[in-house]
């Protein structure tokens, strides 16, 4: 009988200890805040080079830099691509001056608008964003085409989900830019 009472007392003490406010505070401390998540996302966007393709550029004395008024807004819908001779560029990949459009064996691809505007990722869910990177799906939709080169989604797909969610949080926090990016031009079309 004493052993049974002792066992219940020990179990009771353990239950109280495991559910103490201190434990709950420690668990909450382990979760990153929204600000921490956005800061992590900003760091990842900068180090992964997202601006290289997704931001129109302005020319400076040091060369082209991302246009601060159009950061991550993708290929400018008002920009026309120059003419080129497909025969003379044979085995090459061409980029426009902004780096937001690329021509290759896959056709012509245009960097997407990653801002939270409705013309960008404004209506995307976090799950869609993660799926687009993890599985290379256009707009993160199951029955959509694959993301086109030069988007290096295969490499980025190895990022932990928490990093992709941090990138998403950062992108949702930046200035929205209205810009409807042209559809890809696939070969033979």
Short names for language-model regions:
Residues 19-22:
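Bacterial signal peptide processing site
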Residues 41, 47-57, 129, 167, ...:
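The canonical Cys-X-X-Cys-His
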Residues 145-154:
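Surface-exposed aromatic
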Residues 69-128, 153-164:
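Electron-transfer interface patches adjacent to heme c in soluble/periplasmic c-type cytochromes
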Residues 24-46, 58-60, 80-84:
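Electrostatic cytochrome c docking/interface patches
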Residues 14-17:
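C-terminal motif of bacterial Sec signal peptides marking the signal peptidase cleavage site
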